[in-house]
Amino acid sequence: MAKKIFSIVFLALLCAGMSGQQVPSIGAISGTQAHNVIWESKLYRQVEFLSDSLCGGRATGTRGGTETAFWLIRRFRQLGLTPINGHWSTHFYEPFGRNVIGFLPGASKRHNDSYVIVMAHYDGLGTLNGILYPGADSNASGVVAMVSVAEMFCTMRNIGRAYDSNIIFVGLDAKSASMKGSRALWKMIEDGLLTDPVSGDAVTADKIRMVVNIDQIGGTMSRLKSGRKDFIIMLGREAAGDGSASLLSTCNLKYGTGLELGYDYFGSNDFTNIFYRKVSDQRVFLENGIPSVMFTSGITMNNNKPYDSVDTIDMSILKRRIWLIFHWLERVM
């Protein structure tokens, strides 16, 4: 019986070879498995929840902000991430806010002291004068992208993929309050309070390989030169290394995301400097010498308006952006 089964398998492989078909590579299978945990209706439901009246626009220190933090904690726990210091969230004051932090070891058999931080701010304008500012693009899209990247990495770890760096996923609060959330995260690092739950050692600045910030990744209105809707902007390629741009291009081709790629803020050096170094959460880390990258689709006329709603986001494009960020991160780790 065993010989018969072997013969059938051998003939099948022989026929596949004669017909020019190839057995998929391990990398191709792995990439497909990671893709399969992210789909458009799932993204829609998550962005819809975060921009719903239940979250109230997610203003720092409000019930809606707390609801959002609890949602992040639930998602991190479901994915199998590990809390830091036994707690999923860390608090700061003036204003009162909380960062939500989850940890993913890079490998099981060996544990490295190299770390990549992937973060997105979850706070928004809230409800002002009775008017809800949903903040679907700004920045429910970035939060959902960050959580989706975490889910893809957890999927890969569960099937045996190992990485050279551990990943720390952070939902930041209070960007709109002078980036208090990212400043609180940096203070944790400075004070030695951000500890590796596997080794128990402090995650010090010299161990942080890179920070990746995802801020407003759902827009399609402010387009690049070609006018295509399906694009993505990566700011900070110099910080990520000389080959980061070509690596992003390679991943874009290899994994079929097919996005138009931009490496500055719509061709303006001044605006690139402002958005990369001044107005988003990677600023705090850049000021402290940590290599940092920002992924964005830029500001649109919907941002910070009552009509920044889930229905303005093209989920098929958001999905491809998430896939590309994940595959690029896999390569640079």
Task: Enumerate the predicted regions with their spans.
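Extracytoplasmic/secreted proteins, especially bacterial periplasmic and envelope-associated proteins
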Residues: 38, 42-45, 49, 63-78, ...
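His/Asp/Glu-rich mid-to-C-terminal helical/loop segments that flank catalytic regions of hydrolases
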Residues: 30, 296-333
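Bacterial N-terminal signal peptides
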Residues: 7-16
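N-terminal capping segment at the start of a domain
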Residues: 23-67, 79, 301-308
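A non-catalytic alpha/beta surface segment that caps or lines the substrate-entry region
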Residues: 57-105, 262
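Acidic/His- and Gly-rich active-site-bordering loop/insert found
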Residues: 50, 76, 93-129
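Metal-dependent peptidase/peptidase-like ectodomains
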Residues: 172-280, 292
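Alpha-helical metal-binding/catalytic segments enriched in His/Glu/Asp
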Residues: 102, 118-179, 325
